[in-house]
A protein has these predicted regions:
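Bacterial N-terminal signal peptides
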Residues: 10-22
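Extracellular glycan-recognition surfaces and repeat-rich motifs
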Residues: 34-66
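Secretory/extracellular carbohydrate-interaction modules
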Residues: 59-126
Length: 222
């Protein structure tokens, strides 16, 4: 490449690359700065409200709180959010996926018994008796914000906390369903939640300073 062409290429890269960084990515995104965003969420158990720019899911009784979005056609997905266990929490918080009812779903949770736990509830019957399947040790703290990420593809799920791989699990009993958040005897604060995947509608997400996820990452990481 001669010098003139090299300079031209460098100028093009300098002009285009910043535009790529600042253009919107596409995902279903909630920053919870607008109280109207609460109307998208279906609360199956517990209480869900938007307070000070965060979605608060609360059920401190000895039972679960679940809030979901989506429909029964959703399959594979990437879910990200910032999540905090608030004061008064006694047990766990996390994600649910492929949910058809409040007794039919998969769940991954960050637990106050110092572990990350995966399980599933199939028509009211808990897998593994409700105990976490192959739990991973984790030093869970109240009032500490964590960045959670769940990647679901086919029968496979993989979970990250603050970018650290916390394990992989497989199960073939549930193929589709809604996604959401869940607590058990806890209060969970959620911010900057985004989700994408095949068939999931999109809203513009600014890729600067946001958790913009791309469906292509699933294929790229394989």
């Amino acid at each position: 490449m001669n010098k003139a062409k090299k300079v031209l290429v460098e100028l093009l890269i300098a002009a285009v690359f910043p535009a790529i960084l600042t253009c919107p990515a596409w995902a279903l995104f909630y920053d919870f700065e607008d109280d109207n965003q609460a109307s998208d969420w279906q609360v199956l158990d517990g209480a869900g409200t938007i307070e000070d720019g965060r979605y608060i899911l609360n059920n401190t009784d000895s039972s679960s709180g679940i809030a979901v979005i989506g429909d029964m056609s959703w399959t594979d997905c990437v879910i990200k959010c910032k999540a905090t266990l608030l004061q008064g929490s006694q047990d766990n918080m996390g994600f649910v996926w492929r949910l058809a009812a409040n007794n039919l779903f998969y769940v991954i949770s960050v637990r106050m018994d110092q572990a990350i736990g995966y399980c599933g509830c199939i028509n009211g019957a808990w897998m593994n008796g409700g105990s976490p399947i192959n739990p991973v040790p984790f030093s869970t703290e109240v009032e500490t914000e964590y960045e959670l990420e769940l990647i679901v593809e086919g029968n496979h799920a993989q979970f990250f906390v603050d970018g650290e791989d916390m394990g992989e699990w497989e199960d073939d009993q549930l193929e589709t369903g809604m996604i959401g958040i869940r607590v058990w005897s806890a209060i969970m604060a959620v911010d900057d939640l985004d989700v994408n995947g095949p068939g999931i509608p999109s809203t513009a997400v600014d890729s600067q300073g946001k958790l913009a996820a791309t469906w292509g990452r699933i294929k790229f990481d394989q």
